[in-house]
Amino acid sequence: MHHPVAPVIDTVVNLAKRRGFVYPSGEIYGGTKSAWDYGPLGVELKENIKRQWWRSVVTGRDDVVGIDSSIILPREVWVASGHVDVFHDPLVESLITHKRYRADHLIEAYEAKHGHPPPNGLADIRDPETGEPGQWTQPREFNMMLKTYLGPIETEEGLHYLRPETAQGIFVNFANVVTTARKKPPFGIGQIGKSFRNEITPGNFIFRTREFEQMEMEFFVEPATAKEWHQYWIDNRLQWYIDLGIRRENLRLWEHPKDKLSHYSDRTVDIEYKFGFMGNPWGELEGVANRTDFDLSTHARHSGVDLSFYDQINDVRYTPYVIEPAAGLTRSFMAFLIDAYTEDEAPNTKGGMDKRTVLRLDPRLAPVKAAVLPLSRHADLSPKARDLGAELRKCWNIDFDDAGAIGRRYRRQDEVGTPFCVTVDFDSLQDNAVTVRERDAMTQDRVAMSSVADYLAVRLKGS
């Protein structure tokens, strides 16, 4: 098996666009910078990632429940959380090209390339577009929250924000969940949803966009146990990616330096994936933060509502600390695609070998679980194959393809990660059996048509 090293990220981006995983948003109008739509295969992969996260983090545990909070929250929420005052990035403009950049990103890229920070700051950084010695404006603070106005007139009273994270919708519902779900620490609240950030320099395909989806969970604990729980969730979340097929050597843990921690954090560790970006190949998949009691304390102070917890057994009242694993759905999407991409060889009908592109996605993530392929468009084969496809579709997402040579159809399915191909051939008319081909090893089993669903159920467990 050959995992191409060269610009695999570019190859995967092209594959994603060509096969309908991802489309540029509004493409017929020229597109929107760094905005993407998810096509038929992309939306299935996204849903499967979400399903696996939800099972692992929420429904697979007895100490976590789910929530779905509003995208537009009261403005006071963002004042209390600190986002109105501190959710800023340093913006600089090149005096050569007049393009704008995040100053910290320019400095980080320099450090990644040279192994040390620029001795003279921005003055040492060349213009990314032209390569000339850089000429930069003074950095200024740029608030990344997207504004909107509610009501018929754009007034200060109507000013609201599209949420830059899903977490705050969880914190403001802490007391509701404690009461209605009868939960007490240690317990968590999970949420998957859209967030919005007015990024200065979006890019790297779907890695950094202004509209994105998060998979976040806030885990509320006694303060004395916070460090232990923090390490637990770092280990748990790292293992989740490995269990779903990402190779360990392509993952690393990155500890935020104390001087770069967010205003709420005592310690943050990022799970990073080796995407292969220019400059620094590593990119954040997920941050796991010890947010201390900052969130519940600030919302209690600003709202006047008591958000502490009373421990009846020990007769003590405390404000819980929060451990937050916060994952980017579309970043996970990108990592799973890149890590699954392989090239190998498969035998052709002429006795030779052809190059084969395969997405070795875990079957639980694969957009299509099986493809039903009649050997030809024969009047007796197609109806039988369509009936089988309809039966299997009751359980899984199934493709039906009767166009072209069978070898070419296998390749089409391999390229999008379909784990199984079910071929209805002329022998099927006599023995009521089909050939089931497995994607990775290309092994084939003859299976009775009445047993195909059971055969797949064993091999698609957890899908």
Curated annotation (Swiss-Prot):
SUPFAM superfamilies: Class II aaRS ABD-related, Class II aaRS and biotin synthetases. One of its GO terms (biological process) is diadenosine tetraphosphate biosynthetic process. The modification N6-acetyllysine is found at residue 394. Keywords: Acetylation, Aminoacyl-tRNA synthetase, ATP-binding, Cytoplasm, Ligase, Nucleotide-binding, Protein biosynthesis. ATP binds at residues 197-199, 207-212, 284-285, 328-331. It is an enzyme of class 6 (ligase). One of its GO terms (cellular component) is cytosol. CDD domains: GlyRS-like_core (cd00774), GlyRS_anticodon (cd00858). Coiled coil: none annotated. It catalyses: tRNA(Gly) + glycine + ATP = glycyl-tRNA(Gly) + AMP + diphosphate. Its EC number is 6.1.1.14. It holds the Pfam family tRNA-synt_2b. One of its GO terms (molecular function) is protein dimerization activity. It is found in: Cytoplasm. Substrate binds at residues 102, 165, 212-216, 324-328. NCBIfam families: glyS_dimeric, PRK04173.1. Belongs to the class-II aminoacyl-tRNA synthetase family. Homodimer. Catalyzes the attachment of glycine to tRNA(Gly). This is Glycine--tRNA ligase. It comes from Mycobacterium tuberculosis (strain ATCC 25618 / H37Rv).
